């Protein structure tokens, strides 16, 4: 199995690659972790990971700047239904639009917009930086065996914007930051996490292993 982690100039690429290699090794999964900016290699991969940090519009421009990459993603994920994981802004790009400073079109895979977080508790700072628990709304194989909820493991977040999904069924998990904030989305063969699995220690490694085992 070959897992393509897309290098388009954004994301914690080294830590993501190392986390996927470690999760595969510790789970006894035979996987080649391929950090690549080659659209053809993405198109032929068995699983695809889209990381991302920074501004939505910048990440979209970076993705568009890689020849054939958006086309390869749409063909491989939508038409060929290969398993896909978006991380942080990589998850946000699954949306229809980003509303950060300007309106930017996303990939349009998950109905909804990415908008600024406005916590009900004014003492909570933006961005949210640090550890928070997740609450699973819809069971999904990527959360198999992962303790969640008030007594669950913590995930690591760094973000000022959140995906406001139109369909509640697409929201797999939330976190509480002055109100519910989308922590994970998914439908069909695609999932995305607002938190960083590669920085989320046991929760993150378990989620990555589940993604590698997942057969949508």
UniProtKB/Swiss-Prot annotation:
GO terms for molecular function: glutaminase activity; imidazoleglycerol-phosphate synthase activity; lyase activity. The active site is at residues 88, 196, 198. HAMAP family: HisH. Its main location: cytoplasm. Pathway: Amino-acid biosynthesis; L-histidine biosynthesis; L-histidine from 5-phospho-alpha-D-ribose 1-diphosphate: step 5/9. NCBIfam families: IMP_synth_hisH. It catalyses: 5-[(5-phospho-1-deoxy-D-ribulos-1-ylimino)methylamino]-1-(5-phospho-beta-D-ribosyl)imidazole-4-carboxamide + L-glutamine = D-erythro-1-(imidazol-4-yl)glycerol 3-phosphate + 5-amino-1-(5-phospho-beta-D-ribosyl)imidazole-4-carboxamide + L-glutamate + H(+); L-glutamine + H2O = L-glutamate + NH4(+). Residues 2-216 form the Glutamine amidotransferase type-1 domain. Its EC number is 4.3.2.10, 3.5.1.2. It comes from Brucella suis biovar 1 (strain 1330). GO terms for cellular component: cytoplasm. One of its GO terms (biological process) is L-histidine biosynthetic process. It holds the Pfam family GATase. Keywords: Amino-acid biosynthesis, Cytoplasm, Glutamine amidotransferase, Histidine biosynthesis, Hydrolase, Lyase. PANTHER family: IMIDAZOLE GLYCEROL PHOSPHATE SYNTHASE SUBUNIT HISH. This is Imidazole glycerol phosphate synthase subunit HisH. Heterodimer of HisH and HisF. IGPS catalyzes the conversion of PRFAR and glutamine to IGP, AICAR and glutamate. The HisH subunit catalyzes the hydrolysis of glutamine to glutamate and ammonia as part of the synthesis of IGP and AICAR. The resulting ammonia molecule is channeled to the active site of HisF. It is found in: Cytoplasm.
């Amino acid at each position: 199995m070959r897992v393509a982690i897309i290098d388009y100039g954004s994301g914690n690429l080294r830590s993501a690659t190392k986390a996927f290699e470690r999760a595969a090794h510790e789970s006894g999964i035979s996987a080649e972790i391929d950090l690549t900016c080659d659209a053809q290699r993405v198109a032929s991969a068995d699983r695809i990971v889209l990381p991302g940090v920074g501004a939505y519009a910048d990440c979209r421009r970076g993705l568009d700047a890689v020849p054939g990459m958006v086309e390869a993603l749409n063909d491989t994920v939508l038409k060929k239904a290969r398993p896909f994981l978006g991380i942080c802004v990589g998850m946000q790009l699954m949306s229809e639009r980003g509303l950060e400073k300007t309106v930017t079109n996303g990939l349009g895979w998950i109905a909804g917009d990415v908008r600024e977080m406005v916590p009900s508790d004014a003492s909570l700072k933006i961005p949210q930086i640090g550890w928070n628990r997740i609450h699973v709304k819809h069971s999904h194989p990527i959360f198999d065996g992962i303790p969640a909820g008030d007594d669950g493991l913590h995930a690591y977040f760094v973000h000022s914007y959140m995906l406001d999904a139109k369909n509640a069924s697409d929201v797999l998990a939330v976190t509480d930051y002055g109100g519910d904030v989308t922590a994970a989305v998914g439908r069909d063969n695609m999932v995305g996490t607002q938190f960083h699995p590669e920085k989320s220690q046991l929760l993150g490694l378990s989620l990555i292993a589940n993604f590698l085992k997942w057969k949508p």
